[in-house]
Design a protein with these regions (language model features):
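A short helix-turn-beta junction within AAA+ P-loop NTPase domains corresponding to the substrate/partner-engaging
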Residues: 174-184
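Conserved P-loop/Walker A NTP-binding site and adjacent catalytic elements of P-loop NTPases
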Residues: 14-160, 171-173
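Dynamic helix-loop-helix/coil hinge segments at AAA+ ATPase domain boundaries and subdomain interfaces
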Residues: 2-15
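Hydrophobic alpha-helical segments, chiefly the membrane-spanning helices
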Residues: 197-203
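Conserved H-loop
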Residues: 166
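Intrinsic disorder/low-complexity segments enriched in polar/small residues
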Residues: 6, 17, 45, 196-197
Length: 203
């Protein structure tokens, strides 16, 4: 078990602790929380956990610019040798344990369209789907659907968003198509009632 104080030397909110417990229990997580509330920390925990297990973690975003920014942030945080980047026109350290990419790139991996890899999904502990509200996009939403449907069931899905409106429906759907129980947690924008969580009865 990871020592949380070693990685996060500050008090965590209840919803963050709930999400961390869910990940440690082997569940996937759907987390919708307001911007600035600390939901990115959950993705960082999944990365720390994967590194501690000598496993890989993929961090996906909908935009090349956001992927580039996350790559720079993670390279500063974890070290350049541990972080790679894959977008449509950039490939850096693609065998790194932390691999940042656009969601379309991950979808293509799931369809076996990356022959130059021996097995890019081998030892993949978790995949973080940042800005997962793009699933509701009429033009690109199918990319997220295909990603979740074809993601190996042994791999935890960490879906993060500030704005997804039907998070409970997304939770139920992921439970059906992906396998592991998904834990849905979200925070209220009210500072007096910031934490609200819903755990599936099977958890």
């Amino acid at each position: 078990m990871l020592n949380l104080e070693e990685y996060f030397p500050f008090p965590l909110d209840d919803f963050q602790l709930e999400a961390i417990r869910a990940i440690n229990s082997g569940n996937s997580v759907v987390l919708t929380a307001p911007t600035g509330s600390g939901k990115t920390l959950i993705g960082e925990f999944a990365i720390y956990r994967g590194l501690s297990h000598d496993s890989r973690v993929f961090y996906t975003t909908p935009l090349k610019a956001l992927s580039n920014q996350k790559f720079r942030d993670f390279a500063n945080q974890y070290g350049e040798n541990k972080v790679g980047l894959l977008t449509g026109d950039i490939s850096i350290n693609r065998e790194a344990p932390i691999l940042v990419m656009t969601t379309e790139i991950f979808r293509n991996m799931l369809y076996g369209e990356f022959d130059e890899f021996d097995d890019p999904l081998e030892n993949l502990e978790s995949v973080i789907l940042d800005e997962c509200h793009y699933m509701n996009d009429p033009q690109r939403g199918t990319v997220w659907e295909e990603t979740i449907i074809h993601c190996p069931t042994r791999t935890q899905i960490i879906a993060l968003s500030a704005t997804i409106a039907n998070a409970d429906q997304l939770q139920n759907w992921i439970e059906k198509v992906h396998g592991p129980t998904v834990c849905l947690l979200y925070t209220s924008p009210s500072p007096r009632d910031r934490q609200k969580s819903r755990m599936p009865s099977s958890a």
